[in-house]
């Protein structure tokens, strides 16, 4: 690859800097093995930015992200900043404004049960034995969270509250295309989640998804009601490849998918805009209770790098190399403390070293 790429690196707070260090070790291995020209610049965000600049998202950080091809984000927040007004705290003052500024309308959250980690899955052993590898594609900027009107009015027995589920054609079309394009990189199946037996917004959702599906004759499309989908994820998650969801339904199902893997330390997340620019981050939090102890699981951060390579840099070979290296490490029984269950555990640094070495060796 001859193109030059630039990544904005935002380590953040808590375990963020520790796990980000491991992801950058792996990036070095990718650069060397695949002869990719990738540069990085570090910027403060969240609590670290409050401490150093007096605000959770400094203008220099936003400008640095604007000049990058993608953003690799760590995690933000912690007890130190909880006394601040909500809109000035690291989470609401940094991550949400970044999503809004870059018009990140789609959220991709993979949930995979890795071989050797079946015991962590809360489902029945015979279900866990089948494994699963699901990508939840969630629309982020429309739906009931943002629809108008919303509010409260009246008093006494006539007091009421109301929210409005609104979806425009363009919002459904663009998130559907993300799901179908993602399925082409995976197992060629999309399951669209709705409530088209009741909701007008879901009827439109299903109609438009069917229209977009005609552009992807190689992709199998199924529709499923949200209530049935929550049950089917428990009954047989292996049946799913890509889940296409509205904002509300994706909020619910992505967390359910995460829960059945058994470890938040393994789950990456991507938020994309229409130009393919993305913000990539672990699905878990900043875990301030274990920060600085060199025991955090860096795999979610490393997998976030893999997503960045796949979706923003179109480097699928490099992303797959990272995923294979992680699979190899787990198959060999290499575990950080959250996965060790009394067995010997490796440190954050050691896990990063092992995965980087496996990428370099081309396992």
Swiss-Prot record:
InterPro entries: IsoCit/isopropylmalate_DH_CS, IsoPropMal-DH-like_dom, Isopropylmalate_DH
Sequence positions that bind NAD(+): 78-91, 285-297
Cellular localisation: Cytoplasm
BP GO terms, sorted: L-leucine biosynthetic process
Listed pathway(s): Amino-acid biosynthesis; L-leucine biosynthesis; L-leucine from 3-methyl-2-oxobutanoate: step 3/4
Keyword flag Transmembrane: no
Listed PROSITE patterns: IDH_IMDH (PS00470)
Cofactors that this protein relies on: Mg(2+); Mn(2+)
Main location: cytoplasm
EC number: 1.1.1.85
Cofactor: binding details: Binds 1 Mg(2+) or Mn(2+) ion per subunit.
Annotated positions binding Mg(2+): 227, 251, 255
GO cellular component: cytosol
Residues the record lists as binding substrate: 99, 109, 138, 227
GO molecular function, one term: NAD binding
UniProt function note: Catalyzes the oxidation of 3-carboxy-2-hydroxy-4-methylpentanoate (3-isopropylmalate) to 3-carboxy-4-methyl-2-oxopentanoate. The product decarboxylates to 4-methyl-2 oxopentanoate.
UniProt protein name: 3-isopropylmalate dehydrogenase
């Amino acid at each position: 690859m001859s193109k030059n790429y630039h990544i904005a690196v935002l380590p953040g707070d808590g375990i963020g800097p520790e796990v980000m260090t491991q992801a950058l070790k792996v990036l070095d291995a990718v650069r060397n093995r695949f002869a990719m020209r990738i540069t990085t610049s570090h910027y403060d965000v969240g609590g670290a930015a409050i401490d150093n600049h007096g605000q959770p998202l400094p203008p220099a950080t936003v400008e640095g992200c604007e000049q990058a091809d993608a953003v690799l984000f760590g995690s933000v927040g912690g007890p130190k900043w909880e006394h601040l007004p909500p809109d000035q705290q690291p989470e609401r003052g940094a991550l949400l404004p970044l999503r809004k500024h870059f018009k990140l309308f789609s959220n991709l959250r993979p949930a995979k049960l890795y071989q050797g980690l079946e015991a962590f899955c809360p489902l029945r052993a015979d279900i866990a034995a089948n494994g699963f590898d699901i990508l939840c594609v969630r629309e982020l900027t429309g739906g009931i969270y943002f629809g108008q009107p919303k509010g409260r009015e009246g008093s006494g027995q006539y007091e009421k509250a109301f929210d409005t589920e609104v979806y425009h054609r363009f919002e459904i079309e663009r998130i559907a295309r993300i799901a179908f394009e993602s399925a082409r990189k995976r197992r060629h199946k999309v399951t669209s989640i709705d409530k088209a037996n009741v909701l007008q917004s879901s009827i439109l959702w299903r109609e438009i998804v069917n229209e977009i599906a005609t552009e992807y004759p190689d992709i199998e499309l199924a529709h499923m009601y949200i209530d049935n989908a929550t049950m089917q994820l428990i009954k047989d998650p292996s049946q799913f490849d890509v889940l296409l969801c509205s904002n509300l339904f994706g909020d619910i199902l992505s967390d359910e998918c995460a829960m059945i893997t058994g470890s938040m330390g393994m789950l990456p997340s991507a938020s994309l805009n229409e130009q393919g620019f993305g913000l990539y981050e672990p699905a878990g939090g900043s875990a301030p209770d274990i920060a600085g102890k060199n025991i955090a699981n860096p795999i979610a951060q490393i997998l976030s790098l893999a997503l960045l390579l796949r979706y923003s840099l179109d480097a699928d070979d490099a992303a797959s190399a990272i995923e294979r290296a992680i699979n190899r490490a787990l198959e060999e029984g290499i575990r950080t403390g959250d996965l060790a269950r009394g067995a010997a555990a490796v440190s954050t640094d050691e896990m990063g070293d092992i995965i980087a070495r496996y990428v370099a060796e081309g396992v």
